[in-house]
Amino acid sequence: MKVIVFAYHEIGYIGLSCLIKLGFKVLSVITHIDDHASEKIFFSSVKKKSLKHKIPVFYPKNINNLKWIDYLSKLKPDIIFSFYYRKILSEDILKIPKLGSFNLHGSLLPKYRGCSPLNWVLINGEKTTGVTLHRMTKKIDHGSILSQYSIKIEEKDTSKSLYKKLCYASMYILNKTLPMILKNKINEIDCTDDFSSYFHKRYPKDGLIDWNQSANNIYNLIRALTKPWPGAFSYLFDKKIIIWKSKISFESYKTPGTILNFNPLIISCKKKSLEILSAQYTECNILNKRNIENISRIKGKKLIIKNIKSFKNLKKILILGVNGFIGYHITNLLLKYNNYKIYGIDIKNNLVKSFIGNEKFCFIKGDIKQYYNWVKKKIKKCDIILPLIAIARPMQYIKNPLKVFKIDFEENLKIIRYCVKYKKRIIFPSTSEVYGMCKDDYFDEENSNLVTGAIKNQRWIYSSSKQLLDRIIWAYGVKNNLNFTIFRPFNWIGPGLDDFKIAEKQNARVTTQIIFNLINGLPVTIVNNGNQKRCFTDIDDGIEALFEIIKNKNNKCNKKIINIGNPHNEYTIMQLTKIIINIIYSNNRNYNFPKFSGFNMLSGTNYYGEGYQDIDRRKPNIDIAKKLLNWTPKTKIRITLRKIINFFINNNTS
């Protein structure tokens, strides 16, 4: 059987070796250059193995161009195999072989699709992982499964020890499955999306330790990134300290990052503490506690291990409404990077409590009307202004329209004018509601009409306030050269959207309200038969897009309006409700929820009050987001709903 092999790293070497041993005819090998300058080479060379067996071997920069597609096509392979090759193969390449293309992935698919599953499973504290041989399709790691092998993750496993286990598992699965493929006996099962997850590529900078995490979380990060990977790190006296090995200690809690003891070296975390067993400070290896005292000359001093060198070069971001749904999630992401200093204000702090004490987070609890001098100074000081203060619950549009106008329009207009005055970049959260009753199949930022209802229908106060602010920002951009990006979220949902205190008053947004009623044995209220269609977007997908707007690579987002939504997650409210019911009661044996109490069917007027008008559907065109942000939403509705339900179960039930 004739095959082409894409391979790299130790598992790539194992895959190629197994094919040669079993008698496959390897026509060509595509690999990467063994670059000692850019990474530590601790694995066997696929290139050398190929040359030893006189197999043509190449390492192209762009395997998907026409030259290489033509070369591979002329070889006429029966199968393409990919073993830890680092580039995505185009559909044109995948369809070349007669029997298909197969990939060996380092996780138990559909869990941990994407990059760096070895590191991610350790970071997330998983107990099992494995390897999967699967068919390659246009969608990454979605093809049908030929074979899987499960591996137990021990508490003391590190990236190195787990990688060895993955190598043995790869050898086992290939020796078991390849002979069947050689006989053209390929048995496959579907790779469903149930319990699927996707993780992005990790970079050395992602190893920055956040001491506001628990000791357990930091321990997992350290063992996931230890040698031969670049390591988890922090800063001591403005010099990097890389921590290679640790164990959890039970010292009393102090400010996270405080060195509690030198012999042994113990550093406090948000919960418990870490004893450092091995570390590297500048060019010196720290293998004992006396060594660190001599290196840093800090014996007897109280000091903090810092997350960053200095704040001078950090991009400063002011987030108004930082404790809200979007504010919390974007802050959580930004603080994981070494590039941002966050200034935030909100009337509550329940979500951002865990950030307080972080040197990169400055928080004021209060109303912006009472702290306007502070807000004004921070607008003048910061690089980016993100005004997230708004009332965004439909019940309030009807009951308190003037309050909605006061907060959503008047307060935000002041912020916009300060941004004009001080020449600051503003990233403004518009809303999908500005499209109103638009009849387009897909709502387009540049061409769709914005259609609202009669004046007596007060539910449009929110949409109209946001639309007018969009127009004002645009005008300031034209006349005063205001640097802005407007983003329009389409039904972002996830943990923390609303809390149960709001749901107790039957005043929460639809997802939270449905879950609350079901968990508490209350009838689920369905408005206008639940035929309204919405496109639901996972908060992590939305935040990923917002993060790209903040980074603004090559200034692509300047003076742009960008829809951020998931057009593939379109469901009626009734369909959404039935999915939630299915998820909740499939877990009922674990939580003993009350029996389903049925539906309470109401008209919009009876539920919200006079002045309500429904919107049948809103579906985004996300071509601009794809182009400018290189972003597409990935998360399916069931995965998002499971996260929300688990969040509420863990935080609101005994």
Curated annotation (Swiss-Prot):
Its EC number is 2.1.2.13, 1.1.1.305. Residues 1-303 are annotated as: Formyltransferase ArnAFT. The record marks 141 as: Raises pKa of active site His. (6R)-10-formyltetrahydrofolate binds at residues 137-141. Pfam families: Epimerase (PF01370), Formyl_trans_C (PF02911), Formyl_trans_N (PF00551). The active site is at 105 (proton donor), 433 (proton acceptor), 618 (proton donor). Keywords: Antibiotic resistance, Lipid A biosynthesis, Lipid biosynthesis, Lipid metabolism, Lipopolysaccharide biosynthesis, Multifunctional enzyme, NAD, Oxidoreductase, Transferase. UDP-alpha-D-glucuronate binds at residues 392, 397, 431-432, 459, 491, 532-534, 612. This is Bifunctional polymyxin resistance protein ArnA. It comes from Wigglesworthia glossinidia brevipalpis.
